[in-house]
């Protein structure tokens, strides 16, 4: 009982589900954000880095980014034997823009060696029926939508300059559930 955790980590859940370690790989799609480009506001959320949270490798294809990160993991004693990876399209708002852009991003993931699944980061006010249907049809065993839900309180959302409401967040969560998107 000495090493018993009070929670189940993502690592342990993925190991149990896939029978081996699965490593997340950050992928930078060069996405924008309506809270940075003037559509909703300028400057972004109070906590947002001007360069985003990704790797800064947006000028490279997903395949090139994938090779870079797999190479780094191959040299690390902790991850050198990892064979399965989760592609994490992380930086900024990856569902911002037309649905065809999201479809292109998802298509670019197909065929990456060792891809066990994908995760797409976005804002709750940038998903709709069409985009949710695209994500629900993703062909991988794992597919997750990572919604930036910093608060359920409108006063806090306004204070941190999120540019969306708690109702937007609720709508996005319900839409994901309706489509079976985790």
Q: What positions do the PLM features span?
A:
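Alpha-helical context
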Residues: 3, 21, 42, 81-85, ...
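A contiguous, low-structure linker/loop signature
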Residues: 68, 72-112
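Broad structural signal for hydrophobic residues in well-ordered alpha-helices, predominantly aliphatic
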Residues: 14, 109, 135-136
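Short hydrophobic/aromatic-rich motifs at helix boundaries and adjacent loops
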Residues: 38-42, 76-80, 103-107, 144-146, ...
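N-terminal [4Fe-4S]-dependent radical SAM core
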Residues: 1-86
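Amphipathic repeat-derived elements
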Residues: 1-10, 110, 169-182
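Conserved non-cysteine loop/helix-boundary elements of the Radical SAM core domain that shape
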Residues: 53-60, 91-104, 118-181
């Amino acid at each position: 009982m000495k090493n018993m955790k009070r929670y189940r980590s993502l690592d342990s859940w993925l190991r149990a589900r896939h029978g081996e370690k699965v490593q997340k790989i950050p992928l930078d799609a060069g996405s924008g954000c309506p809270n940075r480009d003037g559509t909703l506001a300028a400057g972004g959320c109070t906590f947002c880095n001007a360069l985003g949270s990704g790797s800064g490798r947006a000028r490279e294809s997903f395949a090139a980014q994938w090779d870079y990160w797999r190479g780094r993991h191959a040299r690390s004693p902790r991850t050198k034997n990892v064979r399965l990876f989760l592609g994490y399209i992380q930086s900024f708002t990856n569902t911002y823009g037309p649905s065809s852009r999201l479809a292109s991003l998802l298509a670019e993931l197909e065929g990456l060696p060792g891809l066990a699944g994908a995760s797409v980061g976005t804002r709750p006010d940038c998903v709709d029926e069409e985009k949710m249907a695209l994500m629900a049809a993703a062909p991988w065993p794992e597919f997750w939508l990572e919604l930036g839900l910093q608060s359920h309180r409108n006063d806090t959302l306004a204070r941190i300059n999120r540019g969306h409401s708690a109702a937007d967040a609720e709508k996005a969560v319900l839409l994901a559930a309706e489509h079976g998107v985790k």
